[in-house]
């Protein structure tokens, strides 16, 4: 039983209340975000992405700030509670007729169970995040092959075309089935071997432009921050909806950038061609 004592501690109580408050806070932010996104034209992916990401960070910071505030009020409460337990006759308890605007006190008896589930969940999701990150970083070290000289020359021209100052790395990889961009300071683009058999030069360049758009937008870093927030807020359905929207709009942002730099027909054909190897594997 000693192992579960923390679940009944003031700190666990503060965490449990923070989880409940987070659901209420995120519902308000979700509702505002949903309304705003509905009012924005479908073609404005950059604006939708910025609004969604900002809303998600507000939810995350609200959770952290609420938890810090709740924990900061614990020392006085804990000392007073212990003193009252030792000398109950020396204290008079005043009951106020007023109540806070939003109170979850009627759920207090469920908080130990709620906190236990949250801690188990965050350990699992943190482990999964760390594992996926390590697996991703290993991709840039194993099963790599250099591009042919003509494709490498095309790639370097595209890098200059979209004003990326430092050439990222690019390789064929035997470990993947779709293009991947990895890294922030030293980004690397990995391409599946099958891609060379299904794409024309123009289609190949369109796919490269999509990955270069991710590099130009520094999406790997922003996605990593988002993934950490996903781990903290794994319990929150309103946060999950916004996080899903962020990922969808991120891809649309890159698609819009590609359409500015290349022919829409070739890009559409390249996306269709990429589906062929995956369908054959299924």
Which residue stretches match the model-derived regions?
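Membrane-embedded and juxtamembrane structural elements of multi-pass membrane proteins
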Residues: 2-82, 102-282
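Low-complexity, acidic polar-rich segments
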Residues: 1-2, 82-102
